[in-house]
Amino acid sequence: MITLFLILCYFILIFNIIVPAISEKMRRERAAYVNYKRLNKNFICVDDRLFSYNFTTSGIKAKVAVDNKNVPIPCSKINEVNNNKDVDTLYCDKDRDDIPGFARSCYRAYSDLFFTT
């Protein structure tokens, strides 16, 4: 009888720890998806670089707007870039040594999407 009681307590404990963590993760993912849909393929300014997001089979990917020389476009040109839908972009899934601070800006773009309150 005591074994059954301990097993029951174990499942209650696990249920009270795991379920709130899963629901919090789902809430954050939903908020990030709502932020992603609100952007509507427009670019946002992160670290004086223009970023946008794509929803792919592996999740949301950040991408930075670049000119024809693979130099990130500054935030001062956001209206031009949002009006011109044929802008070149680089995805953040690969590290770029030729662009200083590329990885840091990408991490910040992801954190701005997922952790805004």
UniProtKB/Swiss-Prot annotation:
InterPro entries, per the entry: Poxvirus_A21
Gene Ontology cellular-component terms for this entry are: membrane; viral envelope; virion membrane
Pfam families recorded: Pox_A21
Q: Which pairs of Cys residues are joined through disulfide bonds in the record?
A: none
- Superkingdom of origin organism: Viruses
Q: How is it modified after translation?
A: Contains two intramolecular disulfide bonds. They are created by the viral disulfide bond formation pathway, a poxvirus-specific pathway that operates on the cytoplasmic side of the MV membranes.
The transmembrane segments are: 1-21
Q: Where is the signal peptide?
A: none
Question: What membrane topology does the annotation report for this chain?
Answer: Single-pass type III membrane protein
What is its subcellular localisation? Virion membrane
Q: Which residues point to the Virion surface side?
A: 22-117
Principal subcellular localization: virion
A biological process (GO) annotation for this entry? symbiont entry into host cell
Keywords attached to this entry: Disulfide bond, Fusion of virus membrane with host membrane, Membrane, Phosphoprotein, Signal-anchor, Transmembrane, Transmembrane helix, Viral envelope protein, Viral penetration into host cytoplasm, Virion, Virus entry into host cell
Describe the subunit structure: Part of a stable entry-fusion complex (EFC) which is at least composed of proteins OPG143, OPG147, OPG155, OPG086, OPG094, OPG107, OPG104, and OPG099. Formation of the viral membrane is necessary for the assembly of the complex.
As for what it does, the entry says: Envelope protein part of the entry-fusion complex responsible for the virus membrane fusion with host cell membrane during virus entry. Also plays a role in cell-cell fusion (syncytium formation).
Which family does the similarity line name? Answer: Belongs to the orthopoxvirus OPG147 family.
How is this protein named in the record?
Virion membrane protein OPG147
Source lineage: Viruses, Varidnaviria, Bamfordvirae, Nucleocytoviricota, Pokkesviricetes
Provide the gene name from the record.
OPG147
